[in-house]
Amino acid sequence: MNFVATFYTHLSALRTARALEGAGVQAELAPVPRALSSSCGTCVRYSAEDPLLERMDADTEAVYRREGDGYVCLLRNE
C-alpha cells in the first residue's frame, strides 16, 4: 500500500523518513499533495504493508493511505 505522512516541521519529516528507511522501507521526502494540507509543506511518501505508525516522529500531522485518486486519513494529530 502507498502512504503519505505530513508533518508540522521539516525536521520531523526527515526523522520519519530515516526511521522508515531503518525499518527497510523505501521512503522519500516530497512536496505535500494539493489535496492534503501541512504546516511545513514537506511530506514523506512510502510503500509498506501497514502504515508503520510507530515509526512516525512526534510532530507528525497526519498519515494517509492512497486509494485510487484520493486519500484516506489513518491518523490525525490536532
Question: What does each model-identified segment do?
Answer:
Residues 1-53:
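Amphipathic, hydrophobic secondary-structure cores in small proteins
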Residues 45-78:
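C-terminal structural segments of small proteins and small subunits
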